[in-house]
């Protein structure tokens, strides 16, 4: 008799009620734990089809409720990128000479590898200075990106990691801030540039915008995202570490990126207008 057969027989001997439940529980544990394939790289967490689906649904709902949960957004990105989309991203790198070098070199973007104090000394309109200035203004760090763990193919996992770590460069080059309205504009742009499903799904967070913000998103920044996302080159193939001293305006032109309307300036002008209107109404009373 097999081990499973002996286990089932033993449980059956304990009673007719407990035996089916205990045997089913054992089978589930055996399927989900013992039959799961081994990790393929350090930190890899293999998932079954059902587990991946549950992760996608759970992280989608959670990130919609709280768009600031970077861990849920990262999990959603990995769960929905498989099987097709992450291979498309990896193949886009393989089809480009610079992309192939990035896959071969496997550079990582951190505050140490980029030497942020040095970037702050570069010319004002350089890519590196623009990036460092954006980080300082938004109060964020390149060291906070989660490591990829739910993508099975090791090379594809690096492609996703590279996209994740380059995200702040996309912010810096476009000038978009990190509050929800800015993130949605950038995610729409990224979706048309990378086709990563998570970036497209993130757009549904527009329901959390105020009416004025929602109108601005659909009238200004979504059209910008469509134009630039469709016209721009594959950003995954940009070797950012090698162009830090390049003029950022020249880079935008080479990549085909149109700079979007300045969200911070727009919000500032609207606050000033609201303040003047409030003072005018108070003066009448």
UniProtKB/Swiss-Prot annotation:
GO term, biological process aspect, one: ubiquinone biosynthetic process
Recorded catalytic activity of this chain's protein: a 4-hydroxy-3-methoxy-5-(all-trans-polyprenyl)benzoate + H(+) = a 2-methoxy-6-(all-trans-polyprenyl)phenol + CO2
UniProt keywords, alphabetically: Lyase, Membrane, Metal-binding, Mitochondrion, Mitochondrion inner membrane, Transit peptide, Ubiquinone biosynthesis, Zinc
Necessary cofactors: Zn(2+)
Pathway(s) of this molecule: Cofactor biosynthesis; ubiquinone biosynthesis
Record: transit peptide: 1-31
Similarity comment: family membership: Belongs to the COQ4 family.
The protein, known as: Ubiquinone biosynthesis protein coq4, mitochondrial
């Amino acid at each position: 008799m097999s081990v499973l057969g002996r286990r089932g027989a033993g449980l059956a001997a304990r009673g007719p009620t407990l035996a089916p439940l205990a045997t089913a529980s054992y089978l589930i544990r055996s399927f989900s734990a013992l039959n799961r394939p081994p990790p393929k790289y350090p930190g890899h967490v293999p998932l079954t089809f059902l587990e991946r689906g549950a992760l996608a649904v759970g992280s989608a709902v959670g990130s919609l409720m709280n768009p600031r949960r970077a861990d849920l957004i990262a999990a959603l990105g990995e769960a929905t990128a498989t099987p097709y989309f992450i291979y498309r991203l990896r193949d886009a790198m393989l089809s480009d000479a610079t992309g192939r070098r990035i896959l071969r070199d496997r550079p990582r973007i951190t505050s140490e590898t980029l030497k942020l104090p040095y970037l702050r000394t570069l010319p004002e309109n350089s890519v590196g200075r623009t990036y460092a200035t954006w980080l300082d203004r938004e109060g964020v760090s390149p060291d906070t990106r989660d490591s990829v763990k739910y993508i099975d193919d090791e090379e594809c996992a690096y492609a996703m990691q590279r996209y994740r770590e380059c995200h702040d460069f996309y912010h810096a080059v476009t000038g978009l801030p990190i509050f929800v309205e800015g993130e949605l504009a950038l995610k729409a742009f990224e979706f048309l540039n990378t086709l990563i499903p998570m970036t497209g799904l993130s757009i549904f967070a527009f329901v959390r915008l105020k009416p004025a913000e929602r109108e601005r998103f659909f009238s200004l920044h979504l059209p910008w995202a469509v134009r630039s996302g469709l016209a721009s080159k594959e950003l995954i193939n940009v070797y950012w570490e090698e162009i830090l001293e390049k003029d950022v305006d020249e880079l935008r032109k080479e990549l085909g990126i149109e700079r979007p309307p300045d969200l911070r300036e727009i919000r500032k002008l609207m606050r000033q207008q609201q303040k003047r209107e409030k003072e005018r109404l108070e003066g009448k009373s």
